[in-house]
Amino acid sequence: MPPSPPRPPKFPGSGRPESPNWGVWVMVLLIVGVLAFGFFTPESFGLGPRKENLESFEAQYKAGRVVLNDPKAPVEVVLSENGSEGVIHALVYRKEIQPKVEMTPFALTYSMSLPDRDKPLLNELSGYRVVESPYRTEEGKNVSLIPEGAQKLSVPEFNRLALEGRIAGGKDGIILAEDGNQNVLVGQIVTRIWPAATGDASVDKQRFERVEVPFTLEFQGDRVKQLLGPDTKFKRESGSWGGILLNLLPIVLILVILFFMFRAQSGGARGAMSFGKSRARLISPDKNKVTFKDVAGISEAKEEVWELVEFLRNPEKFRDLGATIPRGVLMVGAPGTGKTLLARAIAGESNASFYSISGSDFVEMFVGVGASRVRDMFEQAKRTAPSLIFIDEIDAVGRQRGYGMGGGNDEREQTLNALLVEMDGFENNSNVIVIAATNRADILDPALLRPGRFDRQVVVNLPDVRGREQILQVHARKVKMAPGVSFERIARGTSGFSGAQLANLVNEAALLAARKGLKEITEAELEEARDKVSWGRERRSLAINERGRRITAVHEAGHAICLLKTPHSEPLHRVTIVPRGGALGMTMWLPSDDKMHQLRSEMLDQLVVAMGGRCAEQIVFGDVTSGATGDIKSATNLARRMVCEFGMSEKLGLIEYGEHQGEVYIARDLGTRSRNYSESTAELIDSEVRFLVDSAYERAMAILTENRDKLDILTEALMEFETLEGSQVMDILEYGEMKNPPARVTPPPMPSEVEEQPGKDDSGHNEKKEAEETRADGAEERKMEEELEQAERAPFSYNPVDEFGKDGGEKK
């Protein structure tokens, strides 16, 4: 009976579509509600009562615009709980509503002996006229000023009408007459007839509006009582449940918001309340399209990890033989060699749950968080077993314990202890396989590397020439590549490139082709991209005068001739005097294959090639420049390694001198470095290094002196064409001329140099024709200048002080 396949895991997004996060929306709405409640009131939108001061309300009260006798909307005075403040709630007529006015005569008789508080409030009137008698003489008869049918008023009634503004003021409206010990007031009572409430809310809203009049009881209480009458009742705010709930509403909203915030943050893997939760991400095969077909150049590493995939697919094949799958696989290699890509391919090929996490995700500022995340990660992996856990950059958490400035009680060490226990502790987690990647395996803790934890170490090296060719072919599938492109040639010229650098090379070639307007990527774009990735972009805009270009041409010609005349050197690929990166010129060679070993004779020829530029300057100019700084440095380093590391000195023998400069790791190297040889040995080392460099200089001088005519021809060719291929340089050395000279390549214009299409302007001038005439004149002038220059150049003399300072530095 065939074994049943493992249960496929449940990946995110494989089931029903996720429902929207209602908690987040509720939280947002609650926040908006609290802000609206705190910063906005109904009055802000014109929905609540209108606020008025006491003076304005008093004026409306006297004008009769305050509704007084409506039982549905009575005038109320509400005091605060402490009784120091109050608010008048009233209904008033809008300004556009005008009443119908009727006049009724009145008469008031009162004793002059009354106290002032009981006398009429004449000050509330706008004016009155005083006469001596309540009678007037008409046709010889005394006629009373009190009209017939006049309403008799008492003093309180008069005062009330005066406060309500219902006494018609003015000198002609009120007459005050003295009658013995009595005073008589005669005037008109104003009766305003307002439109009554209809009961229709829309109609009444157009007639009335509510107002609130705040006042202080201590200073304005008596005035309010006098205005509204002595029978005015003051009531305090009631502590009803509605008011209490209204006051508690902001607090309740804030608590609800905090609840949803903590719930939302604790629900995610990166929530603020989930410090101890694992940040491992479950990789879905629907989203991960990388397979082993996308991984090239590391065949041995693919075979090592393929066993994991095969075991997960068919475990009985291994169990029948008693074999167990490795508990952990550690992938070690330089940056960019494809360790993470290999892990993604495992995730794409296997049917098991695949968790991915970075080593830095375990370490936080809080104590115990890292260990808690390790335990939670393995708990998740056990629930979906069989499963794979990929830890990228494990050196962030797996450094050797007991070292460093933090001592032995570091938070990172607690995390590492938890990881060690989970991988191979008291409990058996055979269904959880850990895959880790690092480029610093030398600093990992030994307990992490022992069998039972990381049983297998897979070394992912830099690809060889065949591997680089395969990697280029993989990345070329993603772009439009022209037919006939030799990936083998590009692979030979990219020795030491990692997979990531090769991917970047193909992408740069695609960008160059797009910049040139090409439909396909040719080999020329790949080579140009290779040069750009290795040494930088061409700097044709660098301002170099004719003398500086000639110095560079002589220097590079010396390198090229020495490269071709030394038997153990690599084949010449290209010579250029176009500035690129930090160099003013460059001589490039193309290795036939990757060399795992280097002979002493090959190193000696490298020293000769390095000295070729300085020797050419000495031969042609009779002096030297500072342009050979990098050559001298590289030659000195190579010669010192030959003496101190490779044992290629007869006088010093097969002994390594000097401490090996490995990876700097503070937990293993806290002291200062010291030499392991004496001063006399140091002098002998220096003499041997000097001997190797001087011997190479003499060989280079002899080669260039013998080929002086070829040096001049190659220099002139570089001055004319700027860049020469290796075959063209070989033609010059063999035949004295090039059989297939290169075409003059015009570099593409910079974006800032792109001008508008020439044409005719408004004045009728033909700009295109004028531009062509200007270019022709300029070409003729340049030709005349070159002829004069050639006449002055024979014989050529050069003084380095003109171009460089006396100390050899570049002239500013």
Curated annotation (Swiss-Prot):
Oxidoreductase in keyword set: no
CDD domains reported in the protein's UniProt record: RecA-like_FtsH
Keyword ATP-binding: yes
Residue ranges, compositional bias (Basic and acidic residues): 757-785, 803-812
Location of region: Disordered: 739-812
GO MF annotations in UniProt: ATP binding; ATP hydrolysis activity; ATP-dependent peptidase activity; metalloendopeptidase activity; zinc ion binding
UniProt-annotated binding residues for Zn(2+): H555, H559, D631
GO BP: any one term: proteolysis
Cofactors (names): Zn(2+)
Keywords: ATP-binding, Cell membrane, Hydrolase, Membrane, Metal-binding, Metalloprotease, Nucleotide-binding, Protease, Transmembrane, Transmembrane helix, Zinc
Topology in membrane: Multi-pass membrane protein
Residues the entry annotates as binding ATP: G333, A334, P335, G336, T337, G338, K339, T340
Domain of life: Bacteria
Active site: E556
Family statement: In the central section; belongs to the AAA ATPase family.
Subunit record text: Homohexamer.
Identification of the protein by name: ATP-dependent zinc metalloprotease FtsH
Organism expressing this protein natively: Akkermansia muciniphila (strain ATCC BAA-835 / DSM 22959 / JCM 33894 / BCRC 81048 / CCUG 64013 / CIP 107961 / Muc)
Gene designation per UniProt: ftsH
